[in-house]
């Protein structure tokens, strides 16, 4: 007996949930950058389709990373907010050879971890992390395998921190005018010069 599948179309001719592949194909075949996925339950499909939301009253962190080829330094910038009010800015750089071969990705990872640590130190139990590098979420959720030291250590520390602070990830497009993401980017670039 064939299991029933639910096909969620996030980006296609007509986003929605479909119960047959043929119906789904009509909405994604030939559609540029179509995004769709199959699930065994309708609820899973609905949850995947639901756009990520953030708790405006909770802690929010915008994180970004940067890298300088000349110096081999990577950096991060973080802007922390609550209810639209800026609470803190974090930025730092390093050139640890274990991580510098991952370029700005190392900065993105350390920015995320430092945002979580800041939240824990200040008594928060939830944080929404806005990021532009997909690995930040995919490594944390186990969807991507960690093959390099930076991603392996990121996962190790993330696992330790997540028992003390719940994380919601929200992907933002890089360099697209998202004000706080642009500020995090500027902080990361500035940290490379200090």
Regions found by a protein language model. Give the residues of each.
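Intrinsically disordered, low-complexity linker/tail regions enriched in polar/charged residues
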Residues: 2, 19-22, 38, 42-43, ...
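Extreme N-terminal starter segment of soluble prokaryotic enzymes
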Residues: 3-6, 58-60
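A cross-kingdom feature marking charged/low-complexity
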Residues: 47-60, 160, 164
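A short beta-strand micro-motif
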Residues: 4-14
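Eukaryotic low-complexity, Ser/Thr/Pro- and acidic-rich intrinsically disordered regulatory regions
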Residues: 2, 51-56, 91, 193-194
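A short, exposed loop/beta-hairpin motif centered on an aromatic-Gly-Thr core
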Residues: 12-17, 30-41
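RNase H-like nuclease fold core
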Residues: 26, 55-109, 118, 122
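RNase H catalytic domain
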Residues: 65-72, 112-187, 192
